[in-house]
Amino acid sequence: GPGFEMPVMILENPSIKNLYDFQNARHRRYTLSSGACCMRFNQPGDEIQKSVNRIQSFEGELQVSEYRGRKQANFMIEKITYQ
């Protein structure tokens, strides 16, 4: 309910299948090998140049979004840790 803080989760060593930049690389969607979708909004400029192969973990929260009647779980990335 209102005021309830979502738990922060950490995905260690994510197996990234592909990524997609949108809105002039301000935002990025990572698709994991499992099919899970991870979203990074307002990514810092220095992250754009870093290799996805060096990503150690994603930190964020799980959210359910609905678009045109279709519900989808997304992991909303708040922080990326690199090796």
Model-derived segments and spans:
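Acidic, two-metal ion nucleic-acid-processing modules in DNA metabolism proteins
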Residues: G1-Q83
